[in-house]
Amino acid sequence: MAERRAREGTATSEFGVSKRENHDSSSFYDRFPAPTLLDDDTVVPCPVQDTILCGDSRDLSAIPDNSIALVVTSPPYFAGKAYETELGEGAVPASYLDYLVMLRDVFAECWRVLEPGGRIAVNIANLGRKPFRSLASDVTTILQNDLGYLLRGEIVWIKAEGASGNCAWGSYASAANPVLRDLTERIVIASKGRFDRAVKRSTREKRGLPFENSIDPDDFMAWTLDTWKIAPESAKRVGHPAPFPVELPRRCIELFTYVGDTVLDPFMGAGQTAIAAVRTGRHYVGMELDPDYVALAERRVEDARQSD
């Protein structure tokens, strides 16, 4: 497999320049170790489509190498016994270190099935306040340092406004021990081996691979900003303890994939990613440990098909 070193100019502005202007920023990037990029155009059509598999997402052997365009997922929270009981036995490891090992194993399988230049978008909530634990940082370390993904950035998902959010403010109106309250989660974005999608669009069309964009230009401008305001989903309405809103995977799908691409969610839950895929003309593959949630997701996906 051929490799190439990333060393290209960009069109971003210099630090301290208020307007956007073209320039060669290689001097800035020269201060960091250059990532090794894979010059690999291997893309395999995915034979497993529009299916939710019941099983452990550390084993994605049913999915071939280099066949997935995008992984978008929200792993189960490491959030305590009540939540873990609702998810079912074995869904969340007992210790935080075991939890990170589980995520690493899943993301390693995601690397295998992603096509070169395929993207992964991981929605995570940071943990606790005594002390605070940055799960976003730990996931970034796993993706970048352990597995070799190329980090593309981090989106801040704003779930509420102003004085909303939880009421655990610590010492109210006092400097004794004020506590920051969560209004946001993170979406860590990374790529497999290269920043661009493997195979040029003109070649994709000739080979019968997905090549058509569907994103609206106004949406593109809004969604390439690193803050997204999206209302959270109702757990009671969906029937799952922690569903992310369908709008979140929909934006990732429109932004990072072509019409007809296959999207994977290794923690499918109530089927939000599959619903977003159906509504945007993409295929989906899901993995879910709990058969009851597989059935729930399949019902909700079918409802989405019927309503479109």
Predicted feature locations:
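Cysteine-dependent PTP/DSP-like catalytic domain, specifically the C-terminal lobe
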Residues: 292-308
